[in-house]
Amino acid sequence: MKIQLRYFASIREDLGLAAEELDSSALDAASLLAELRARGGAYAQALAEGRPVRVAINQVMARADTPLTEGAEVGLFPPVTGG
């Protein structure tokens, strides 16, 4: 299925990419992250296991088991903190 990926903050900087369209076989948020990590290189580093990454699907915060649908917009970003 085709999905639209949007990268934010340090993930965007690490990848050198703000957005891309992906033809993915991932069924949910967790399997999408695994698929992206498997690309290796900057993807493996930016989305490494243990590195906190938040996922939003169609602008709604997603859990690992949140399903993906054809044409979904998926945002990936680090947790935001402030003071």
Segments and roles (model prediction):
Residues 1-82:
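Ubiquitin-like/PB1-type beta-grasp interaction modules and other compact soluble beta-rich domains
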